[in-house]
Amino acid sequence: MTKLSAQVKGSLNITTPGVQIWRIEAMQMVPVPSNSFGSFFDGDCYVIQAIHKTGSNLSYDIHYWIGQASSQDEQGAAAIYTTQMDDFLKGRAVQHREVQGNESDTFRGYFKKGIVIRKGGVASGMKQVETNSYDIQRLLHVKGKRNVVAGEVEMSWKSFNRGDVFLLDLGKLIIQWNGPESNHMERLRGMNLAKEIRDQERGGRTYVGVVDGEDEKASPQLMEIMNHVLGQRKELKAAVADTVVEPALKAALKLYHVSDSEGKVVVREIATQPLTQDLLSHEDCYILDQGGLKIYVWKGKNANAQEKKEAMNQALNFIKAKQYPPSTQVELQNDGAESAVFQQLFQKWTVPNRTTGLGKTHTVGSVAKVEQVKFDAMSMHVQPQVAAQQKMVDDGSGEVQMWRIENLELVPVNTKWLGHFFGGDCYLLLYTYFINEKPHYLLYIWQGSQASQDEITASAYQAVILDQEYNNEPVQIRVPMGKEPPHLMSIFKGCMVVYQGGTSRANSVEPVPSTRLFQVRGTSANNTKAFEVSPRAASLNSNDVFILKTQSCCYLWCGKGCSGDEREMAKMVADTVSRTEKQVVVEGQEPANFWLALGGKAPYASTKRLQEENLVITPRLFECSNQTGRFLATEIPDFNQDDLEEDDVFLLDVWDQVFFWIGKNANEDEKKAAATTVQEYLKTHPGGRDLETPIIVVKQGHEPPTFTGWFLAWDPFKWNNSKSYEDLKAELGNSGDWSQITAELTSSKPEAFNANSNLSSGPLPIFPLEQLVNKPTEELPEGVDPSRREEHLSIEDFTRALGMTPSAFWALPRWKQQNLKKEKGLF
């Protein structure tokens, strides 16, 4: 019987973020060494556990991977072990079924350098990767722009096509052949994979050569080797288009209720997109079908034990019934331990008894009471995580310039109107703050709900012009009326006023209302604003403070549920609304004139406001593209700064605001389409997102701490020393002389390339550095080849002795190698 062994339980990591992998061997879980992570056999099945840390919370994912040539018994064992591991973790894990060739983005994300799938398996005597083994011949087909998967294919030109990257691995030589229609990123990923094989599997003692398919004549010696090994070159196949998933398909959600209460399993459709969390009952199990792309099974914590146990089988039966491909991805979600991806398929997802971060943006009627927090502005940059959570780059004490869109042009706003935002206008506000005496800029684009479409368009256009005047350094923040972020409010020190309509233009003929009512929200100078509402009694709320301005007086109405801090901030902002003396009115003690000004008494919200819902917000990073003529967003799991490519644009979704990051070498069309791209993302989001979500445009090299704080260990100097594809290619020594290797390989038949040849000789025994440096031949330890002393060193000693890595050394011309060995006492 398949059962999780005590040895596996004892070695199971449950506290430290990271990955563990086991291979199914003779129906048992056998650990895979870390230097073999990312290498899989198509005849085997594997179990992978990943632990992630978000804040102080740990989350668990368990995947079982099915090789296309694996046996049914091995597949069944992997599935059972996955369930048992989840049981051992007390139901805290998300379970994933992965099938070769259709792995999830989450799975691929664990292997940033790429995945290599090899032929064979444990049944045919195949072992995991052995370091320094050169008895290898294989052709790898590299697929994928970001997290690549390289599978072994037939060693023949027939396997090639014009659009992909291929690695011909011959032990001590790896040739990367780039299809003439492959793109820059595919070539870079292929090169990184080739270097990974060289450094991890061969200890750096392998040459890597690159052939660009559009210019094969530039690499005659490498092409001679390829033709010798692969046979005579024939016409190449056309490029094969990558599979594109339509966003609409991702948003096509259907929820099914699963029950076996009648003695047989009954699956019944109960809802379609948009979905809400209250559709899920703790007593039952459910299947969520995402357009046939992925199947989720949600297991209620109080559901029937048998239903829980059969969850995976129910999903597989569902796939068969729907005639979906057998490789369809499956995820099992435990009640209370749902993944962020699953949660965001719903309109909103809340978790009881979990505190939330500060500084969410809200509209009137759903505004949360924000606890006052004292912070030092400089700490926002020392601790960007705090800045990201609070959405504050500083305390709002920087320099301010403000313009209004008038006749589609920028007109400076009179000083007396700073902090006043009229719903019939659009404004640009440039905020300047300094870090170590260097200026940084935020460009707010505030768009009134009653502004014309021409003015809204002009505000975006003028923002681009202003951005260019400041060398494209400002961070652009689109702010729809009612979505004002905390930092914008902090600039006006508790005196920000938002009017329903109207304008602050000097020549305006629009009449000013004789009676105005403002709802005040906020507890400090950093989070307070007054928002105009309809002047009638029904607009009141017992939890808040309101300002009622009439022609004769100004009332400050204090609801029974408001706090002392809220009353004090309301008094401050009331002076901005009206210069007249304020009459404080306590709820229940209103004078007759108060109700008269509001058109008479009427029912209003008087129940105690519920505590703010604990929305679960997990930041998600997406690579964006519109190169195919339609918007595509590819998620990057477990993201870090390295995932931000200079040639691309990315979208960072933190739910109540969305960042759009632009790499310095990004496509011009993608740069210009920032707002459109984010809007398209929000429209096609299966969670039914608010299209008025604030959009923040960030350029590479000018990231504010509110952005960098979502990344672990952000390095502001990372791109100063980054290397291009051309730089990496030059490092490989492709301009060198390949004649010796060419002669070695082409002097014998392809099948003779093995560890017995000079080129592919196996690893030599390792000795301490001090036993090899500056020693005459007779004093060398037994077994040392005097002419190859450097090959008897560990990688660490090699690097210390020669001042470079083995891979860099082997890329040097032979004469340079010899001179360096003489200089370092290894000749």
From Swiss-Prot:
Chief subcellular location: cytoplasm
Residue stretches of each Gelsolin-like repeat: 27-76, 148-188, 265-309, 407-457, 528-568, 631-672
PROSITE patterns: HP
Positions of the UniProt region annotated as Core: 1-734
Keyword Metal-binding assigned: no
Molecular function per GO: actin filament binding; calcium ion binding; cysteine-type endopeptidase inhibitor activity involved in apoptotic process; lysophosphatidic acid binding; phosphatidylinositol-4,5-bisphosphate binding; protein homodimerization activity
Region (Necessary for homodimerization) location: 1-126
Residue segments, region LPA/PIP2-binding site 1: 112-119
Domain of life, source organism: Eukaryota
UniProt xrefs under Pfam families: Gelsolin, VHP
Renumbered residue ranges of the record's region LPA/PIP2-binding site 3: 816-824
Coiled coil: none
Positions of post-translational Phosphoserine modification: S366, S735
InterPro entries registered for this protein in UniProt: ADF-H/Gelsolin-like_dom_sf, Gelsolin-like_dom, Gelsolin-like_dom_sf, Villin/Gelsolin, Villin_headpiece, Villin_headpiece_dom_sf
Record bears the keyword Phosphoprotein: yes
One BP annotation, GO: regulation of wound healing
GO CC terms: actin cytoskeleton; actin filament bundle; cytoplasm; filopodium; filopodium tip; lamellipodium; microvillus; ruffle
Domain HP: 761-827
Chain residue ranges for the region called LPA/PIP2-binding site 2: 138-146
Entry similarity comment: Belongs to the villin/gelsolin family.
Subunit structure: Monomer. Homodimer; homodimerization is necessary for actin-bundling. Associates with F-actin; phosphorylation at tyrosine residues decreases the association with F-actin. Interacts (phosphorylated at C-terminus tyrosine phosphorylation sites) with PLCG1 (via the SH2 domains). Interacts (phosphorylated form) with PLCG1; the interaction is enhanced by hepatocyte growth factor (HGF).
Protein's UniProt name: Villin-1
Organism annotation: Bos taurus
Gene that produces this protein: VIL1
